[in-house]
Amino acid sequence: PHVSVIENIMMSPVKVLGEKRAEARQHAGMLLERVGLSHKANAYPAQLSGGQQQRVAIARALAMKPPVMLFDEPTSALDPEMVGEVLNVMRGLAQEGMTMMCVTHEMNFARDVADTIWFMDQGQILEKATPGTFFRAPQHARARRFLSDLLVH
């Protein structure tokens, strides 16, 4: 809460990776543009919406140049109108070839973006399938029940 958005994104590359501040600042600016927040570079976390904070968190993670991004319910705490902002950034990452593992209940997003769906229940992987197969013809009874409940409600 005491550093600006751009300083927040620069912090780990400078401290952990040893990047020069100027290089880290330039990269952070590019990442903010990538997540649609270049205009918020000098803002502080308290000045951002939940969706903006989540997109800054994505930019901060990308600043470390990871080979894989892990997302655990990235939209669960967001107001409905903010969900699309975050999902659009994640769609862009997928289109750019970023490997992502995402725990989500956003089934439309999973259907559109995933290469593989792993359906889990109580910590166990019950089914692994392509999105087309999973949503059309799930093999496990628990997966069928889950999808049926989604379609009913």
Predicted regions and their residues:
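Catalytic Walker B motif of ABC-type/P-loop ATPase nucleotide-binding domains
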Residues: M69-D72
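Short coil-to-helix segment of the ABC ATPase nucleotide-binding domain corresponding to the Q-loop/switch region
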Residues: V3-M11
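Conserved ABC ATPase signature
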Residues: Y44-L48, Q52
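A short, proline-enriched helix->beta-strand linker immediately N-terminal to the Walker B motif
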Residues: A63-P67
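A short, surface-exposed alpha-helical micro-motif characterized by mixed small hydrophobic
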Residues: A110-D112
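Hydrophobic anchor residue at the start of the ABC signature
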Residues: I58
